[in-house]
């Protein structure tokens, strides 16, 4: 093989038996870009509005509201406590107490809601039957161990 300034690789094609040289190019270096871009203008919207538009007008509406030609909004004043803030109160109509109209339980509801009895809730027979279902996978049986007193 001859040596030269560029690197050659030999590959064999399936159709041909002769090796063919393939040149390997050095990776391209990235060009450094100068920062000639203008700074990004960030716009915070404190009081958003709802608009309706169709799909074809959506892009135009977004450009109108946020693009270069968008009208700059007046910045809101920074919060500072003043005497006006202490006098703020919600409208009187919102202060009226709300009464929920609930009917007491009727006879038809009492069939669904029976009072709980503690004796009915914790019967040992029901509890042991319930727990044995957890252990019935064949590895061991709870009843094979016998009682605790026999150990």
UniProtKB/Swiss-Prot annotation:
InterPro entries in UniProt: SIB1/2, VQ
Subcellular location: Plastid, Chloroplast; Nucleus
Record text on subunit structure and interactions: Interacts with the sigma factor SIGA in chloroplast. Interacts with WRKY25 and WRKY33 in the nucleus.
Organism: Arabidopsis thaliana (Mouse-ear cress)
Intervals of motif VQ: 58-67
Keyword list, A-Z: Chloroplast, Nucleus, Plant defense, Plastid, Transit peptide
Stretches with biased composition (Low complexity): 1-13
Region (Disordered), start-end ranges: 1-41, 66-93
Pfam families: VQ
Span of the annotated motif Bipartite nuclear localization signal: 16-32
Phenotype reported upon loss of the gene: No visible phenotype under normal growth conditions, but mutant plants show impaired induction of some defense-related genes triggered by pathogen infection and treatments with salicylic acid (SA) and jasmonic acid (JA). Increased susceptibility to the necrotrophic fungal pathogen B.cinerea.
Domain of life where this protein originates: Eukaryota
Tissue: Expressed in leaves and roots, but not in flowers.
GO biological process, any: defense response to bacterium
Protein name: Sigma factor binding protein 1, chloroplastic
Transit peptide endpoints, chain numbering: 1-54
Protein role: Contributes to plant defense. May regulate chloroplast metabolism upon infection with pathogens such as Pseudomonas syringae. Functions as activator of WRKY33 in plant defense against necrotrophic pathogens by stimulating the DNA-binding activity of WRKY33.
Induction pattern: By light. Accumulates in response to infection with the bacterial pathogen Pseudomonas syringae. Induced by infection with the necrotrophic fungal pathogen B.cinerea.
A single GO cellular-component term on record: chloroplast
């Amino acid at each position: 093989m001859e040596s030269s300034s560029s690197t050659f690789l030999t590959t064999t094609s399936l159709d041909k038996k002769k090796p063919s040289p393939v040149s390997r190019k050095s990776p391209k270096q990235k060009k450094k870009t100068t920062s000639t871009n203008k700074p990004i203008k960030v716009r915070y919207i404190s009081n958003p509005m709802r608009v309706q538009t169709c799909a074809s007008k959506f892009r135009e509406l977004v450009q109108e509201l946020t693009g270069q030609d968008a009208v700059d909004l007046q910045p809101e004043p920074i919060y500072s406590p003043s005497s006006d803030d202490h006098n703020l109160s919600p409208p009187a109509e919102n202060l009226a107490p709300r009464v929920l109209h609930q009917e007491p339980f009727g006879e038809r509801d009492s069939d669904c809601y029976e009072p709980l009895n503690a004796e009915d809730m914790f019967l040992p027979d029901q509890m042991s039957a319930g727990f044995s279902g957890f252990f019935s996978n064949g590895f061991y049986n709870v009843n094979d161990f016998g009682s605790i007193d026999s150990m």
